[in-house]
Every structure is written in structure tokens, then in C-alpha cells.
Amino acid sequence: MKAMMVVGTTSHAGKSFITTAICRILARRGWHITPFKGQNMALNAYVTTTGGEIGYAQAVQAWAAGINPRVEMNPILLKPQGNMTSQVILGGKAAGITTATNYYEQYFDKGWNMIVHSLERLAVEYDFVVCEGAGSPAEINLKHRDLTNMRVAKYLNAPTLLVVDIDRGGAFAHVVGTLQLLDESERALIKGIVINKFRGQRSLLDSGIEWLENYTGIPVLGVIPWREISFSAEDSLDLLERRRKEQKEINVTILRLPHIANFTDFEPLDAEKTVSISYLDLNEPLGYPDAVIIPGSKTTINDLIALHESGIAKQLQDYVAAGGIVLGICGGFQMLGEMVFDPDQLEGNNVSYAGLNLLPIETVITPEKIVRQRHTCSVYPYPGFPITGYEIHQGVTRSSKSPHQRIKTTNHPLFEDGSLGIVNDNQSVWGCYLHGIFDNGAWRRNWLNYLRNRRGLPSLPTGIANYREQRETVLNQLADLVEQYIDLTPLLNN
């Protein structure tokens, strides 16, 4: 199977960005290609048409390649849960929860076999695979059990691109150090270096590049300038850097939960020119934005406890009582109710926990994980729009059965499938299980218009395309940028 690999000197060097761009570049040239990342650690996940769970970044790369995401593109997904544990997703299915030490004892051989099997299946259908590494390929304490960097490159005999982030400083040292820590057979696969996120005059790098090429014997194939292009972040390090202060017509606050998951849900909101998004730490005052979103969570109960202990829970209750709007998605939806029950103690040491008391519902955490794509139609905020999204959760939510129910309101279904979400009588509290809900353009605009009309602002047009069309524009922008500044010829000719 013909292949190439993209690795980085550090995390966040730009591997995903460049891999995605290369997928789109080659697809535009008519190549029948597929992305691949043997093992990914991320909280942003996507559900394939077969009900398998993969990293969201690999789904984006598949779309860049012009194909549908599938589990073979990311056979191992690790979803951190806190307390040094992660949920292991093998071949798209939850396989268990483990620590880092136990993971390699339990899953190393099984994981490598899964990687090889996935590559063999992809080889049957695709002519070329663009592989992405993880972290750094030169972590000395991890190299012997690294499943996703040079082990994959050597298996495929793939010419490899080494990416370095110069914006952090120390780029030349990062490159030289990484190469020195690779063994000879691994270094032989490195066919080019890319300097990413460069700010300033390109000619100032010339002497450094000349030295680097002479010292390493490896050509610098490109210098990518810093560009403000919206791109799916893989984990919360990027999220922490996204603190938008600019106020716009509609201001939405998203709670930065300790175990936040699937915050890629909010990219379509971020792309709305009249909407300002800010992520709020739980030790900050809530204020009075136009809406507050409680996002998905990898551990609903732990994040619910954090909301209570931080005082945000009480602030949310006061905010709603004063006329504010709250939307909970997935784990955030589960938190909105009166109680969350955990009879098997899957997430905590108790069997019941007080919710936020904003909706007359209760949730029971269950061992079975629901992972599936969904297609339905809207009921609120406007009926009849086709809706697509996906569920990833453990737990069943139902109307509260408490004889002392405190919340005197009626639940109204958000969608024709009432199990997917509800809204209360005065449309101040919304909850849904659907990830990707804002990808649905007409639904997103109608929900935003509801917020706008409350402020006396005119409605925006609702006859707009879904976010996938905007994403296509972004993918083409990424490809244009990389194609302009990187010479891929040495990698493709090999």
C-alpha cells in the first residue's frame, strides 16, 4: 500500500492541520486516498454510519479526502476520563476503562493487530493512505510501546514529513533533537521538514534553514505562515487559548467543564458573524449572556459535582429565574434535571446526585453506551426542519418520577423523536442528546433568531445551507495554503 506519514516534534505542531490539507490536495488531484491515525487520544469524537466511534479529526480528514468516515481510519481512540484513566475504543466500540500502565499491558498487542487489520482493509479500497502520528515520535520512555508514529511508518515503509511549530520558539532544537532520538531506520524515513506557524519576514529564516538542511541532510520542504483559519481542535489545549472577548449582537457562554467533550459542536456557532462565543472557567462569574451552553462531558457526575462546588449551579438557577436561556447537550442535558442516578457506581462513589433542577427530568447512568447517528425532524424552535446528528452517551433520561417534583413545567419535545431532546414551557431551558445539532443550518439560525428576537434584533435568514458546506470552504482554504507553501513532490515520488 502506498502511503506517507506526518509526524510532529511536539503535540500541537500542526500534524492534523497538515494531514487534513494533504488529504484535500490529493483528492483534488484525483487520488483515491484515505486518512489514518492508528491511535488517537481526544475527547472530540464522531460516530460513523456503522455506529463506530472515531476521533473527530479523522472524520474531518475523511471529508477532506471526499469519503465517508469509517472506523478503520482510527482503530484506537483513547478518551481521558480523569484520575489517570481513559476509556478505550477499539475498532469503534468501547472496550473498557484502564490506566496508562494497564493499557499497554492489556491492549498493546491487541491494538497493533487492530492497526494492521485496519490498514489491510483500507488497502483493498484505497490507492494511498495519509497517516498522522501522535504527540512526538521521539519520546524515549514511550518509544518501545508507541503504536502510532514510526512503528506505523516502518510497517508501511512510508516517507515521512516532520512538522515543527516555530511560534513556540526553539524550532531548530526541536527538529535536531527529534532526529537524534530516532534510530537510524526511523531517520531514514524522514524525507522532509515543514516549519509551521511562522510570523514575520520569510527571508529571516534563510540562514537557519540552510544550516538545518546541511546539518541534518534533510530538506525543508516548506514554511507555512501563521494564518487565522478556523480548524477543528483535537483537545482542550486549543480550547484554553480560545478566549474571545469581542462582544457581538448575540453573546453565548460555554461552560469549560473539567471533562468537556465534543466541543467541536460549537464550530458552526463560532462561524456565525453575529455571534460571539466565550468559554467560561467555573471559577469565573457567569454574568448575563444571551445564552449559556452546558456542553458534553466525559464524566457527567464529576462535572455536575464541579458545577455545584464552584457555585456555578446556583448562578445558573438564578440566571434562568431572571430570564436567561440555557442549553445542555448530551452530558450537559443530563445535568439539567433533578437527579442523576448511578446505580452501578460507574462514574462515582454514590448512587444518586442532585442535578441542576432546571428541567423535570432524571437520568440513570447505564453500562451500555449508546453510539449512533440519528435523523429526525425539528419541533422547536420551528417545526419541520430535517435534523441530523449523533449520540454518544451512557444513560437514559426520562421525566421525573419524584412525588415531590419541584419544577412545575411541562416538557415539550425538541424533535419528532422525543427521546432526543426537550424544552420547557417558556423555552428558557433546552436539552438534547444530539451532537452536531448546530451543523443543521436552519435549526441553528432559528434558535439564534429566538435569542435575537428576545433582544429586539431582527431575524436572520433561515434558508441557509448546513455547516458541511462552510466546512468545505475551510478545507479548500487549508489545502490552498499548504499547497502554496509545501513541496510534496519528494514525499509522493518516494
From Swiss-Prot:
Active site, per annotation: C330, H435
Keyword field: Cobalamin biosynthesis, Glutamine amidotransferase
NCBIfam families in alphabetical order: cobQ, PRK00784.1
Family: Belongs to the CobB/CobQ family. CobQ subfamily.
Gene Ontology MF terms: ABC-type vitamin B12 transporter activity; catalytic activity
Gene3D superfamilies according to UniProt: 3.40.50.880, P-loop containing nucleotide triphosphate hydrolases
Protein name, entry field: Cobyric acid synthase
Its biological purpose: Catalyzes amidations at positions B, D, E, and G on adenosylcobyrinic A,C-diamide. NH(2) groups are provided by glutamine, and one molecule of ATP is hydrogenolyzed for each amidation.
UniProt domain GATase cobBQ-type: residue ranges: 249-443
Organism expressing this protein natively: Crocosphaera subtropica (strain ATCC 51142 / BH68)
Taxonomic path: Bacteria, Bacillati, Cyanobacteriota, Cyanophyceae, Oscillatoriophycideae
Lyase as UniProt keyword: no
Superkingdom of the organism of origin: Bacteria
GO biological process per UniProt: cobalamin biosynthetic process
Pathway: Cofactor biosynthesis; adenosylcobalamin biosynthesis
Record InterPro entries: Class_I_gatase-like, CobQ/CobB/MinD/ParA_Nub-bd_dom, CobQ_GATase1, CobQ_N, CobQ_synth, GATase_3, P-loop_NTPase
